[in-house]
């Protein structure tokens, strides 16, 4: 019971960290503190006159913006708190005889790597491949925490439900397609391409003749003093944005098909309805981002919607792939 409650708290806290990370990134505060783990050579944001003078001498090329610096440091503080929660979960799993052992250890290693990605995000000046990897690390972390939570709960029998037993492959494909779409979303955001297209449904103008696929999806974009606000030209950013929109159409179609097929199951009908509801919300948020020119609250909510969709699909896959006769734990 203690482990279950700790996992619930940690799941909510992880979602908070993801949303705070999105808020920091979308507020252009990713380099609010140009060093790591401190901020302008201090543990906290420098505010006193002597601290500001020292900070300016260390980073003469940076304009100190306390609001952005505090956003970045708050994100680091709560991420550190999440790390402590994950360590507590690992220790509890080690002490609990029938709890999984390898999965919590992997989660600990993942959050350590996530911390390294957070450092590289700053030291590599918001290099898009690092920023996207950091975003994916957060989504992977919350997904694995949910999986651990599901495995510590009493087992539910779903495999015997013949009406949905053959849907496991479709659910798995849907999960991987959604992950691909989340990657495209992260690539769009990290390359500052969210407003490259302002018309619906695909893009304005003769976009098909102006695609720049090679430039748009090159993981390494050369040497630059900073990648803040993006370094790609308009055509490359437009290509990224279009790929994300087309990916959204494919993903939405597949998830709707999965939800329709799951609706016949008495055990998974609620998850089917939740999936449809979250999908409608996510598409609405995506359209609102375009029409309203990326308002901060809606853009952050779009990140949160992606996380909730991912958690829903992880849960669906767990129940569909779980064999009730299996008693082994990793």
Curated annotation (Swiss-Prot):
<feature type="topological domain" description="Periplasmic">
    <location>
        <begin position="292"/>
        <end position="295"/>
    </location>
</feature>
<keyword id="KW-0350">Heme biosynthesis</keyword>
<feature type="topological domain" description="Cytoplasmic">
    <location>
        <begin position="267"/>
        <end position="270"/>
    </location>
</feature>
<feature type="transmembrane region" description="Helical; Name=7">
    <location>
        <begin position="271"/>
        <end position="291"/>
    </location>
</feature>
<dbReference type="GO" id="GO:0006784">
    <property type="term" value="P:heme A biosynthetic process"/>
</dbReference>
<feature type="disulfide bond">
    <location>
        <begin position="33"/>
        <end position="39"/>
    </location>
</feature>
<comment type="similarity">
    <text>Belongs to the COX15/CtaA family. Type 1 subfamily.</text>
</comment>
<dbReference type="Pfam" id="PF02628">
    <property type="entry name" value="COX15-CtaA"/>
</dbReference>
<feature type="transmembrane region" description="Helical; Name=1">
    <location>
        <begin position="3"/>
        <end position="23"/>
    </location>
</feature>
<feature type="topological domain" description="Cytoplasmic">
    <location>
        <begin position="1"/>
        <end position="2"/>
    </location>
</feature>
<keyword id="KW-0408">Iron</keyword>
<keyword id="KW-0479">Metal-binding</keyword>
<feature type="topological domain" description="Periplasmic">
    <location>
        <begin position="24"/>
        <end position="76"/>
    </location>
</feature>
<feature type="topological domain" description="Cytoplasmic">
    <location>
        <begin position="317"/>
        <end position="330"/>
    </location>
</feature>
<feature type="binding site" description="axial binding residue">
    <location>
        <position position="244"/>
    </location>
    <ligand>
        <name>heme b</name>
    </ligand>
</feature>
<feature type="topological domain" description="Periplasmic">
    <location>
        <begin position="124"/>
        <end position="128"/>
    </location>
</feature>
<keyword id="KW-0997">Cell inner membrane</keyword>
<feature type="binding site" description="axial binding residue">
    <location>
        <position position="302"/>
    </location>
    <ligand>
        <name>heme b</name>
    </ligand>
</feature>
<dbReference type="GO" id="GO:0005886">
    <property type="term" value="C:plasma membrane"/>
</dbReference>
<feature type="transmembrane region" description="Helical; Name=3">
    <location>
        <begin position="103"/>
        <end position="123"/>
    </location>
</feature>
<protein>
    <recommendedName>
        <fullName>Heme A synthase</fullName>
        <ecNumber>1.17.99.9</ecNumber>
    </recommendedName>
</protein>
<comment type="subunit">
    <text>Interacts with CtaB.</text>
</comment>
<feature type="topological domain" description="Cytoplasmic">
    <location>
        <begin position="98"/>
        <end position="102"/>
    </location>
</feature>
<feature type="transmembrane region" description="Helical; Name=2">
    <location>
        <begin position="77"/>
        <end position="97"/>
    </location>
</feature>
<comment type="pathway">
    <text>Porphyrin-containing compound metabolism; heme A biosynthesis; heme A from heme O: step 1/1.</text>
</comment>
<feature type="topological domain" description="Cytoplasmic">
    <location>
        <begin position="150"/>
        <end position="166"/>
    </location>
</feature>
<feature type="transmembrane region" description="Helical; Name=4">
    <location>
        <begin position="129"/>
        <end position="149"/>
    </location>
</feature>
<feature type="binding site" description="axial binding residue">
    <location>
        <position position="134"/>
    </location>
    <ligand>
        <name>heme o</name>
    </ligand>
</feature>
<comment type="function">
    <text>Catalyzes the conversion of heme O to heme A by two successive hydroxylations of the methyl group at C8. The first hydroxylation forms heme I, the second hydroxylation results in an unstable dihydroxymethyl group, which spontaneously dehydrates, resulting in the formyl group of heme A.</text>
</comment>
<feature type="transmembrane region" description="Helical; Name=5">
    <location>
        <begin position="167"/>
        <end position="187"/>
    </location>
</feature>
<feature type="transmembrane region" description="Helical; Name=6">
    <location>
        <begin position="246"/>
        <end position="266"/>
    </location>
</feature>
<dbReference type="GO" id="GO:0046872">
    <property type="term" value="F:metal ion binding"/>
</dbReference>
<feature type="active site">
    <location>
        <position position="72"/>
    </location>
</feature>
<keyword id="KW-0560">Oxidoreductase</keyword>
<keyword id="KW-0472">Membrane</keyword>
<dbReference type="GO" id="GO:0016653">
    <property type="term" value="F:oxidoreductase activity, acting on NAD(P)H, heme protein as acceptor"/>
</dbReference>
<keyword id="KW-1003">Cell membrane</keyword>
<keyword id="KW-1133">Transmembrane helix</keyword>
<keyword id="KW-0812">Transmembrane</keyword>
<dbReference type="InterPro" id="IPR050450">
    <property type="entry name" value="COX15/CtaA_HemeA_synthase"/>
</dbReference>
<keyword id="KW-1015">Disulfide bond</keyword>
<feature type="disulfide bond">
    <location>
        <begin position="197"/>
        <end position="203"/>
    </location>
</feature>
